[in-house]
From Swiss-Prot:
It is a multi-pass membrane protein. GO terms for cellular component: plasma membrane. Residues 9-33, 504-523 have a biased composition (Basic and acidic residues). It comes from Bacillus subtilis (strain 168). One of its GO terms (biological process) is spore germination. It is found in: Cell membrane. This is Spore germination protein KA. Disulfide bonds: none annotated.
């Protein structure tokens, strides 16, 4: 009892300490003046008080106008601004304009002095500091109770490159960057329509991360939009460093291995999903964009499916789904067959497997778990190592460990083949989030097969499908258009029909503008051949 009281007192003291720190932060915010002062000296002092001794915050005081009567201060953060813009479009025009009068300095600078596109006046300290942290420059003038915010964002950024996680043999070669505005502009180049709306907000009480919600007005479901806006407004956290934060805070189901939001770094993928009625969430500082509502079949679709012929795309999609289930159940089937159901194995194959396992001291389940864990370690090591040696380590390591394990009699050659086939099959899933889900579920199926044989495996598969059917992505059934079945949605699910036959958007996603193309879009080869023959006949007659 005393120990319990001591722990409770420690918890209460920690809660009280956290409450005191929170109250202290709120008190400091209250002490900061809401509006700027007409005194330039006070404004500079308030800025220094807020940013502390940060060496990258530049405060440059200059005197301009006739006889230097106007006293200004230009404040910006080095590294977040474009230095050429600061000097050529900000400092130089201010110094050269001698017509500026002290009584109307801010108004004159705003209206005619600066050639910058984005300049606006502001009085609120909160807004000014927020813009300063974004890379914009501030101009204060002595005797004026408002400052100017100048658009000077710049600094070093990664150039547009080919996506590294979603490589395509056909299609655009550009991927998203870490710049929010650049990513938005890349999507707008695909969808040149005023109904493509972008709503920006800031999340993270400390980081103040910019987030953009993008959708096509009139195509995206209004109920889904209302739901996602409510979930985004509810977010109250100190930092947002990557889109994964947002995904985990707004997804429908937390306790599931299956992803209920799709992420990509390809602008054409985002554009295609927006045109189907989905929305996208873009986070500043990351090239990965979130897309929802997400469906189970969506994770087996690749961008080049839509750039290739429908028959080729259909065959590859079916192959991906089959390979996905092979990666799920292959080790479990081997464990169940060799442990409980030897009568189902052909006699000659059973004799070969029995001869291989004669010197193996462990049961099949231990073999499977050991090799699976070893392959997962090698795969993780290959990802974390430098790219030059990572792939070599994973491949060579797998060969060496597999051969050594067989020679040592720890595992059988058949088990090495099964695990290797499973590892290769997992790479065929286009979406990494779905592939890693299979890697986790595979262990559950192996244990179920070791306990109950094929009965345990079948029970596990049934439970998995029941769980999949219970999932929702922003209210949309995760297994649609298969469950519930949709005749229109199934045209672009496990297989893809020709473009001329896919007249409407997916019913489970888009409730507004469902029609995406006109009727009678099917090409008429017979008529085309007739036209060609007619042209040839007319040409022959003219020649004679």
């Amino acid at each position: 009892m005393p120990l319990f009281s001591k722990r409770k007192n420690n918890t209460d003291s920690k809660d009280k300490q956290n409450t005191d720190e929170r109250n202290q932060e709120q008190q400091q915010e209250k002490e900061r003046p809401v509006l700027i002062s007409p005194s330039l000296a006070k404004n500079i002092a308030e800025t220094k008080k807020e940013v502390g001794s940060s060496s990258d915050v530049i405060i440059r005081e200059i005197k301009i106008g006739e006889q230097d009567h106007v006293h200004l201060a230009v404040i910006y953060i080095s590294g977040l601004v474009d230095n050429n813009t600061i000097h050529e479009s900000l400092i130089d025009p201010l110094v050269q304009d001698e017509s500026i009068q002290n009584t109307h300095a801010i108004q004159q600078i705003l209206e005619k002095t600066l050639p910058l596109g984005g300049v606006k006046a502001e009085k609120s300290w909160d807004k000014l500091f927020s813009e300063l942290m974004l890379g914009n420059a501030l101009i204060f003038a002595d005797g004026h109770d408002e400052a100017l915010i100048c658009s000077t964002q710049g600094g070093e950024q990664r150039s547009i490159q080919e996506p590294s996680t979603q490589v395509s043999f056909r299609g655009p070669r550009q991927g998203f960057t870490e710049s929010l505005q650049t990513n938005i502009s890349m999507i707008r180049r695909y969808i040149k329509n005023p109904n493509l709306w972008v709503e920006k907000m800031k999340k993270g009480s400390v980081t103040n991360t910019d987030i953009a919600l993008m959708y096509i007005q009139g195509i995206c479901d209004e109920k889904v939009l209302k739901e996602v806006k409510q979930r985004l407004e509810k977010i109250d956290i100190d930092s947002i460093l990557e889109s994964g934060y947002i995904e985990q805070l707004i997804e429908d189901e937390t306790f599931t291995t299956f992803p209920t939001m799709y992420h990509t770094e390809r602008p054409d993928v985002v554009a295609g999903n927006l045109l189907e009625g989905r929305f996208a969430i873009i986070v500043d500082g990351t090239p990965f964009v979130l897309i929802a509502p997400a469906l189970f079949v969506q994770f087996f679709q690749s961008v080049e499916d839509y750039y290739s012929r429908f028959d080729i795309a259909t065959s590859i999609r079916i192959l991906r789904v089959l390979v996905f289930f092979i990666s799920l159940v292959a080790p479990a089937v081997y464990v169940a067959a060799t442990t409980f159901h030897q009568e189902m194995i052909p006699t000659q194959l059973l004799v070969v497997i029995a001869a291989q396992r004669e010197i193996v001291p462990f049961p099949a389940v231990v073999e499977a778990l050991t090799m699976e864990v070893a392959f997962e370690i090698l795969r993780e090591a290959g990802v974390r190592l430098p790219r030059v040696v990572g792939s070599a380590v994973s491949i060579v390591g797998a060969l060496v460990i597999g051969q050594a394990a067989v020679q040592a009699g720890i595992v059988s050659p058949a088990m090495v083949i099964i695990v290797a086939l499973t590892a290769i099959a997992s790479f065929a899933t286009p979406a990494f989030a779905m592939a890693i889900s299979a890697r986790l579920i595979r262990f559950i199926f192996i244990i179920a097969s070791a306990v109950m044989g094929f009965y345990g495996l079948i029970l596990g598969i049934i439970m998995m499908f029941v769980h999949l059917c219970s999932l929702r992505s922003f209210g949309v059934p995760y297994m649609s258009p298969l469950a519930p079945f949709s005749s229109q949605g199934v045209k672009d699910a496990l297989f893809r029909v020709p473009w001329w036959a896919d007249e409407k958007r997916p019913e489970s996603v888009s409730k507004e503008d469902k029609v995406r193309q006109g009727k009678d879009q099917r090409p008429e080869p017979a008529a085309s051949r007739g036209m060609v023959n007619k042209d040839l006949e007319e040409g022959d007659q003219n020649g004679t």
